[in-house]
Amino acid sequence: SAMGQRTGCPLKESNMVSRYKKEFLELERIGVGEFGSVYKCIKRLDGCVYAIKRSKRPLAGSSDEQLALREVYAHAVLGHHPHVVRYYSAWAEDDHMIIQNEHCNGGSLQDALLENAKRGQYFLEAELKEILLQVSMGLKYIHNSGLVHLDIKPSNIFICHKLAVEGHAGQEESDSEDEFSSGVMYKIGDLGHVTSITNPQVEEGDRRFLANEVLQEQYCHLPKADIFALSLTIALAAGAGPLPHNGAMWHHIRKGNVPSIPQKLPDGFLELLKLMIHPDPVERPSATALTKHPVLRPSLEKTVQLQKQLNVEKCKTAMLESLMKDQPLSAKLPESETSSKQNSKRLVGGKNCRSFSFTLGY
């Protein structure tokens, strides 16, 4: 009976008409993987374009089903963030599982790298920093939600080009997506390997991007495995050759050596990429640290300095004011000096005010 079929599987749809065919118009296949295929579709109801992932339905109750459901559960936990591919819906029909996600009009970073390779090009410094910064923002959000991605690589980073046509209509509502002057947004997708930081069920991602400690089944610093994979992703975007799956070169990289990059990048930037693949995960910067890193956000560094200076000045002023409240300066000075405005002014001006010292916790 139809009822009998539905038990024990959270993904069963009982009605026989395909929801996929009914609700979506398939335009083209845009991706294919071991799981199945991704199609660019228009939803008939709203006229919007979506990326629809159709995969062979795993056996109910199998470990494959758990894996297939990870992505759905992860999206449910995560909610919406500008640097994570947005999730809309998931369901199952006949022998397929279907996930409806945001469509990124620029394809994946992997697509862009293949295109670059054909033309003998690669991403340059400014773009590389932009990718690193934006993906770090997505990772910061994922990690702060208590999750890790565990499959960061070019084919799981998606590119959205802001269309110029969007013009003036939506200019008032400036959200975090407008920070990026380049008009390109990079987003993390494919959450099929996502797991919890505190209670991880690790399904290893791509060997080429895998940190050694994860291979050794040491899971105490899992977010740093995402950082490791992100560094190698940036190296590839910078023009590095294909990464090894194993062997001597694989181990050479795990000792903290960035794959050779065919363009001149600033030392500070290369040092950062090197730090991100440090053999000791504790030494690698967190995603939060990357989002504030002076190499990626030089203007932020200036702002922080000015903020500190301002705080110091505020502190001095406050202390001077409280001192003057407690003991009026006039009480401390001989008559002749109080009458001389110049001196009291100099005392308050703080230039040669040596009457107290204080330290600030920076």
Which residues are covered by each model-predicted region?
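Protein kinase glycine-rich loop
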Residues: L27-E34, V38
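Glycine-rich ATP phosphate-binding loop
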Residues: S37-P58
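Short beta-strand micro-motifs within the conserved protein kinase catalytic domain, predominantly
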Residues: R86-M97
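Conserved short submotifs of the Hanks-type protein kinase catalytic core
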Residues: D95-S108
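Terminal C-lobe "cap" of eukaryotic-type protein kinase domains
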Residues: P279-E283, A289-V304
